[in-house]
Amino acid sequence: MSIENLKEALPEYAKDLKLNLGTVARGTVLSQSQLWGTLVATAAATRNEQVFKEIREEAAGILTPEALDAALGAASIMAMTNVFYRGRGFLDGAYDDLRPGLRMNIIGNPGVDKSEFELWSFAVSTINGCHYCVGSHEKVLREAGLTREQVLEALKIAAIVAGVAQALATVPALV
């Protein structure tokens, strides 16, 4: 189970994704923990079992158990908060004065460096399409000292993983 397995499973029409996935997994401007946490969190966010399984199994040999749990926690909590804040945004401010009333304790105590958790949350929020959360997480990341290049790299990883998941979802229908 690995990135290589995902690359091999991609059809020819997804060759660009195959190349991009290989490039980003070999190393980036992110630390190994930032990179693999972003890969795990975004793989979980795609809801594609094959993509998640392959990435998670390789990441388990790189990330600490705490970082692996935190990456999955980022995907889970963002699944909830992205829907809430994106949905509230559709209501033109009519509900902005009300408390969400949602537990989000993992955001304050993720079990890993908070900037890593924010990076993973940012990447998942891009997949989930919540521009409020994307903007909020980007601001926190920049204030924490991450560079524009690091933030953009997480965005790029999210885009690649989402593309890989979409391409692999079509393969069974082609046979």
Swiss-Prot record:
| InterPro entries, alphabetized | AhpD, AhpD-like, AhpD_core, CMD-like
Instruction: Provide the alphabetized UniProt keywords.
Output: Antioxidant, Disulfide bond, Oxidoreductase, Peroxidase, Redox-active center
Q: What is its EC number?
A: 1.11.1.28
Q: Which biological process terms from the Gene Ontology are attached to this UniProt entry?
A: cell redox homeostasis; response to oxidative stress
Q: Give the top-rank taxon of the lineage listed in the UniProt record for this protein.
A: Bacteria
Recorded catalytic activity of this chain's protein: N(6)-[(R)-dihydrolipoyl]-L-lysyl-[lipoyl-carrier protein] + a hydroperoxide = N(6)-[(R)-lipoyl]-L-lysyl-[lipoyl-carrier protein] + an alcohol + H2O
Active-site residues, Swiss-Prot/TrEMBL? 130 (proton donor), 133 (cysteine sulfenic acid (-soh) intermediate)
A molecular function annotated in GO for this UniProt entry is: hydroperoxide reductase activity
Disulphides: 130-133
**Protein family (similarity comment):** Belongs to the AhpD family.
Question: What is this protein's function per UniProt?
Answer: Antioxidant protein with alkyl hydroperoxidase activity. Required for the reduction of the AhpC active site cysteine residues and for the regeneration of the AhpC enzyme activity.
Summarize the subunit comment.
Homotrimer.
- The molecule here is called Alkyl hydroperoxide reductase AhpD
